[in-house]
């Protein structure tokens, strides 16, 4: 998650200069500060929290991925104007994919989540990312509204990623447990 200042806010006629802008704040990338796991409809009681990959899949086995971040501390008066989720897709079969991100509204733990106990999530899609899964590439999604809500009401239950149609194919993303060595 990365926060950046809003250009329209900076260009408002009422803005007094010099403007003090705090640096961009980024969440920790340490595996201990990120909870992530994927779930499978086919293996509905299995847990995949300690896997190097997060999967999204459609067809006869639906897979969805869940992520939750320890948010950086911000001061009173700080304003969140932009928050992005940036992940790495490991490529697949060259098919065009569309990933949807949803806000999770029920508590969950990465070590115990499975298909049968998956948390409730908002049906409203926060953002979509369309890309061709043909090589390693960054997948970037706007999660500004969700992050603002997490800070405002303390309801950080994370997010869920899924393929938009869940009809066929799969997407493989790096998890926080990816071994970069």
Predicted regions and their residues:
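Residue-level detector of buried hydrophobic side-chain packing
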Residues: 21, 69, 83-85, 101, ...
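Short glycine/proline/serine/threonine-rich loop/turn segments at secondary-structure transition edges
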Residues: 11-17, 76-81, 148-157
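Flexible, small-residue-rich N-terminal segments that precede or flank a structured functional core
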Residues: 17-73, 103-109, 117, 121-122, ...
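Beta-strand-rich interaction/scaffold domains
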Residues: 89-157
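A short beta-strand element within beta-rich, extracytoplasmic domains
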Residues: 67-69, 79-92
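Beta-strand-rich interaction surfaces with strong enrichment in secreted/lumenal proteins
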Residues: 7-10, 52-58, 71, 126-132
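Short edge beta-strand/strand-turn motifs with a hydrophobic/aromatic core
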Residues: 3-5, 9, 67-72, 141-144
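Terminal domain-initiation and capping elements
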Residues: 1-26
């Amino acid at each position: 998650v990365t926060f950046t200042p809003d250009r329209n806010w900076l260009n408002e006629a009422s803005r007094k200069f010099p403007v003090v802008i705090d640096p961009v704040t980024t969440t920790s990338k340490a595996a201990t500060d990120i909870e992530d796991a994927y779930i499978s409809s086919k293996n509905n009681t299995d847990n995949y929290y300690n896997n190097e990959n997060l999967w999204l899949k459609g067809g006869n086995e639906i897979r969805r991925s869940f992520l939750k971040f320890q948010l950086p501390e911000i001061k009173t008066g700080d304003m969140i104007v932009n928050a992005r989720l940036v992940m790495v897709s490991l490529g697949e079969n060259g098919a065009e994919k569309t990933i949807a991100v949803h806000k999770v509204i029920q508590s969950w733990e990465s070590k115990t989540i499975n298909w049968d106990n998956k948390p409730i999530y908002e049906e409203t899609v926060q953002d979509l990312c369309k890309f061709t899964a043909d090589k390693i590439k960054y997948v970037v999604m706007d999660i500004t509204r969700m992050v603002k809500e997490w800070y405002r009401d303390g309801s950080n239950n994370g997010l869920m990623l899924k393929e938009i149609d869940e009809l066929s194919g799969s997407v493989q993303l790096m998890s926080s447990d990816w071994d970069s060595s």
